[in-house]
Amino acid sequence: MTQITIPAQVVNGHLQHEKSLAELEGEDVLATLTVVPKHAPPIDWQKSRDRIDSFNALKDGWDSYRAPAPSTDAVSQAKLFLEEAATSKFAPSRFSPAVVGGVGFTFKRAERKVYVEFRNSGSVHALLSDGVSDPVVEKVQPNQSAYADLMLRIKGYLHE
């Protein structure tokens, strides 16, 4: 039994590799496929902090419609959450001002998504969705301890 490693990639749904298997003709071969996803480049946490700070400069109607600008409290809570994400070494896929007033973060992996929203009202909610079953919405207490728990929940949900 021979075991070999062949670097390959998936292109248009097909496995492509550059190594010929002709040299193994007639041998019993154990083939194991390990999929290692490509990851986005590492996040620049300081740039992300600065970007969230920039949300304080937005005015009502920032989206060219009637979106309320994020409140200073929503921005502060979003920064606290970003710090917890940095501590957890788990970067959001994206974050932006929310059109309902506040700041929203999206975490995605395959079909699963978690959207965390810091509303101008002071409330914080997390929506967990897999694209198949009904989304689940959870209320989150606006404090660092709850954000640490939420980061664990997000990691677990996206990697189930």
Predicted regions and their residues:
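Eukaryotic low-complexity, non-globular regulatory regions
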Residues: 1-92, 125-160
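Amphipathic, interaction-prone secondary-structure segments
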Residues: 75-120
